[in-house]
Amino acid sequence: SKSSSPCFGGKLDRIGSYSGLGCNSRK
């Protein structure tokens, strides 16, 4: 959930999954 790298953030996404695992989920 970071502007630098959407794939890597370490923060919990809205769905509760890590940003690193929700690479495609963000788009």
Curated annotation (Swiss-Prot):
Cysteine pairs bridged by disulfides in the record: C7-C23
Subcellular location: Secreted
Keywords tagged on the record: Disulfide bond, Hormone, Secreted, Vasoactive
UniProt KW Disulfide bond keyword: yes
UniProt key word Hydrolase: no
Record-linked InterPro entries: Natr_peptide (IPR000663), Natr_peptide_CS (IPR030480), Natriuretic_peptide_brain (IPR002408)
GO annotation, cellular component aspect: extracellular region
GO molecular function, one term: hormone activity
Superkingdom assignment: Eukaryota
Gene Ontology biological process: blood vessel diameter maintenance; cGMP biosynthetic process; receptor guanylyl cyclase signaling pathway
UniProt-listed Pfam families: ANP
SMART domains: NAT_PEP (SM00183)
Signal sequence annotation: none
Cited function: Hormone playing a key role in cardiovascular homeostasis through regulation of natriuresis, diuresis, and vasodilation. Has a cGMP-stimulating activity.
UniProt similarity note: Belongs to the natriuretic peptide family.
Protein name: Natriuretic peptides A
Native source species: Anguilla japonica
